[in-house]
Structure formats: C-alpha cells, structure tokens
Amino acid sequence: MNVGTRFFVSLVAALAALTANPQSPPPSALINQESEETVEAARSASPHTSESTYAYFREEAETFLAEATQRIWDPDAPREPSPRTAWGDPDLSGYWLNVAYVPLERPVELAEKPLYSEEEAITAFVRWATQDASVDPATVHYDWTEFGMDNWQSPVRPNLRTSLIVDPPNGRVPPLTPEGLVRLEQQARRHTLESRGLYERCIQGNQGPPRVPFLQNTGQSQIFQTPEAVILITQSNSDVRILHLDSSPHAPQSVRSWLGDSRARWEGDTLVVATTNFHHGRKWDGSAGDLHLEERLTRVARDTLLYEATMTDPTTWETPWSVEVPWPMMDPPGLFEFACHEQNYGIINVLRGARVRAAEYEAAQREASGTE
C-alpha cells in the first residue's frame, strides 16, 4: 500500500466515523455549541436535506482527497515544455486557481526544513483539508460550497513545501523596519471609512497583486493573451490587469493606481512582470506606495502554472522576500459575477466597532502615560 493510499484509507475511516450517525449533530454544531433548533433552522434554509447533508459531506470529501493525494507538488520535479500561442509566445491562457493548504510562513519548529517528505506532505494536507471540509454545508453560509468553490472542492493538491515563502531561507517574512512597524500599527487603527481595507470597501479584490492565497477561495482567475499584452482577470472584485509587452517605460511616479503600473517581458517560457507606482492609500502587510513587485508565471505542466513573486520595499522590510505558489487549472472553468457593493451595509457596524476599539485604545494609552 503506497503512502497516498494508506493516508486516504485512514482519512476515510475518520470521515466515516464522523458522519456515520445521521442523528448526531454536525461538526459545526459541536464546534460552535449551537442549539438543536438553530441547526435545524439552518438546515431548512439549505437545499440539502438532513440526510443528504451527511452524504454530501462524506462522499465529496472522500472523492476530493482520493484524487488530490495521487499528485503531489514537488518544486524540484522536471517541468514540461510550455505550449505555444499561434504567434509563438508561451501559452498561459486558461482558468487558474490561486489556492493552497500551505501556510505563508513556515512554522518556527520547521525553520530548518523547507520541504516535507511525501508522507508528511499528505499528512499536513489531509489535516487542513479535513478541517476545511468539516464545516457543515447545511448551516447558514456564503455560496462557496453550493457552487463548489471551497478550497477542499478545488484541484488543489499536497505540496512538499512547508511554507509559501521560499526566501529568506527560514520561510518567514523579514523583520519590519522601524518605519514599516509604525505604518503597520497605523494601518491597524481603522476608525474612518477611508482607513478600512480596500477589499472590505469593495474597491479592490483580495487577489493582490501580489497573488498570495487568501482565506476565502476567491482565487479564481482567467488569463488571455495577445501579441502585445497578457490580460489577467480575477473573480475577486472583477479586477483586471493589463500586462503590456511593448517595452514602454513605467508611468511617472506621480501616476499611481490601486493595482500599480505593470510592464511584462518574456524570459524563455516565463512571463516576468515588474509592477511599481502603487497608490499610497493601498495597504499590504505594512507596505504602501513604495512596493516594487516582480512576478514570474511559468506553465510547468498542462494543468499547472507556477506563480513566483518577490516583494521589495526598503521602507517596510529589512530585506526582499519571495513566495512560490502552484496554480492548478480550474475544473470546471469559468468565473462568477462578483457582487460586493450591493450588500455592503455591514460597513456601518464595522466602522462603529472600529471606533469603539480606537477609543478604548486611546483611553488605555492616556492612562498608561498618566495624562488622564
């Protein structure tokens, strides 16, 4: 019995034990200590019946893990030659998914271990995927599960890497500069509409740039090409990036945008994208308008793009740092409409809560300094 089969068998046993009794409460009820009445009310609002909920969870999760554990992402594996467009450029076109069950930063206890063994990679993958899939689809939720868009329903597969960060060698975000630390603390104090995040305000999606996987599975994107440009569309907020290939210079520093100003070129089979001129109001991990981003996209297999990104901002981090994320091809392909502003009345309560927290923080600071 190979490694993948052995872990899959143990997983099936765990899932079967969890879902064998249709009278027992669903996992979310156990986690959240919800009442039986609340769970039943949630089920009645779902297209799944009580019985089909358990079958749905068990059968789809088992199928997903059976398929996923047959292919493991190995960064050192040989790469396939890239297919070509009609005009001879590497063909990156298609629908791709930016998703991973790998942490951005390497756990401290794995600081000297950049790669898992296959057995360890499958163990980590099964742990994260099982936890993700254990959210009962009969409870009230967004439409991710109904439309097959949760991470555990995607073509994501185990990864030998122990972190998405590949440089520095310890797999951790470099220390912030004093200026970056102050900026990050200021960004955390969000008590006005303009200081809230762009994603929260429906101005920009959660897919960067840079394209670091987000908690929600909104990493769906489409790439199409012309001889003059590569166009990248993300489902999240319907963001569009036009990556010009004409060797023109970047826009003047006074011209800035939320997605930055990008210029692209081909290096062999790899598309290299340099992006500068980010809007100073854009906030990303403490960085703002001084971020210089280099992204690299390579089609390493028929159904896989390799995304690499290096972030440089001397005003924020002590050194540059880089991530690597394999993008599986979406199956089935296609993007959904991303409606955001239409139901964003919750921002009022968010702002109210932020102002209360800010007032409490300022009062505590005054008390600590003896000025109150």
Q: Could you describe each region identified by the protein language model?
A:
Residues M1-V9:
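Bacterial N-terminal signal peptides that target proteins for export
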Residues V9-T19:
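Bacterial N-terminal signal peptides
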